[in-house]
């Protein structure tokens, strides 16, 4: 049995909240730089130039990449042989988010009640997804989600007889309706299967996969390629599509 003090979790969550809002992952930076070189449109080239400059300024001045620093979404995998000591794990996570957003000078947007609209002042509470695994390891991923893109999310309950082409067409139609609202270039996560909440979770989790990786299952990798091609024909800058079926969600 491995013991971990919850203060370590608090500190790590705090650091990740700041880092995730100031720096893009290396694979995403490389993807943007590659797309910037290959972009043919003069307008597109100017947009990519602004994005690259924004990344540089954020890194050099230690300020957020975007003014919308989002809701903190936390994916946490806990080994079943881990015992947390020193207090409440839930409180530690919330304290970590609060410290990250206040000490990192990040915008606090979360309200205590959706109808009363009273800001909590520290961007808590976060959305936390817990997964129990074997062993003694703990993995924490913080993925701030801004609502410019979150508000463009959609879910459709389809019948078992739905075809792959119908799934692709629906995803393309969602992107077409969203247009420029989610601030292109965009990364698209697609969940397939499960129930209402599971499918939405899969779509959110798919966004955490490296943009340099494709689905390990050939059928879904081909589906990704088909979506990518059709969505790019819309003229909306797209970096990646990532469908995640239920049985390969952790790949």
Where are these regions (language model features)?
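Acidic/polar, glycine-rich intrinsically disordered N-terminal extensions of enzymes
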Residues: 1-48
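A generic, well-ordered mixed alpha/beta core segment in the N-terminal half of proteins
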Residues: 70, 74-133
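Flexible, glycine/charged-enriched surface loops at secondary-structure junctions
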Residues: 24-31, 43-48, 62, 103-116, ...
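N-terminal low-complexity or amphipathic/hydrophobic leaders
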Residues: 28-79
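Single conserved hydrophobic/aromatic residue that forms the stacking wall/gate
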Residues: 240-251
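Catalytic or ion-translocation cores adjacent to nucleophile or general acid/base/metal-coordination motifs
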Residues: 198-234
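Short beta-strand elements
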Residues: 64-73, 77-78, 128-146, 246
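Conserved mixed alpha/beta catalytic, RNA-binding, or beta-rich assembly cores of soluble enzyme
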Residues: 142-208
């Amino acid at each position: 049995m491995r013991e971990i003090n919850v203060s370590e979790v608090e500190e790590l969550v705090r650091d990740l909240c700041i880092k995730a809002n100031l720096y893009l992952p290396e694979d995403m930076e490389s993807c943007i730089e590659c797309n910037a070189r290959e972009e043919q449109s003069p307008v597109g080239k100017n947009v990519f130039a602004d994005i690259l400059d924004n990344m540089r300024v954020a890194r050099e001045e230690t300020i957020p990449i975007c003014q919308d620093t989002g809701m903190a979404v936390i994916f946490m995998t806990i080994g079943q042989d881990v015992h947390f000591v020193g207090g409440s794990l839930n409180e530690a996570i919330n304290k970590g988010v609060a410290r990250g957003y206040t000490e990192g000078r990040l915008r606090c947007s979360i309200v205590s009640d959706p109808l009363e609209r009273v800001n909590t002042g520290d961007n808590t509470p976060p959305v936390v997804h817990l997964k129990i695994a074997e062993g003694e390891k703990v993995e924490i991923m913080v993925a701030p989600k801004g609502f410019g893109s979150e508000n463009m999310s959609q879910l459709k309950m389809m019948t078992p007889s739905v075809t792959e082409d119908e799934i692709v067409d629906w995803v393309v139609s969602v992107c077409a309706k969203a247009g420029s609202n989610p601030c292109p270039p965009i990364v698209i996560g697609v969940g397939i299967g499960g129930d209402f909440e599971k499918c939405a979770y899969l779509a959110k989790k798919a966004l955490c996969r490296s943009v340099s990786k494709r689905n390990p299952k050939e059928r879904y990798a081909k589906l990704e390629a088909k979506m990518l091609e059709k969505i790019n024909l819309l003229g909306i800058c797209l970096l990646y599509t990532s469908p995640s079926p239920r049985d390969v969600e952790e790949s």
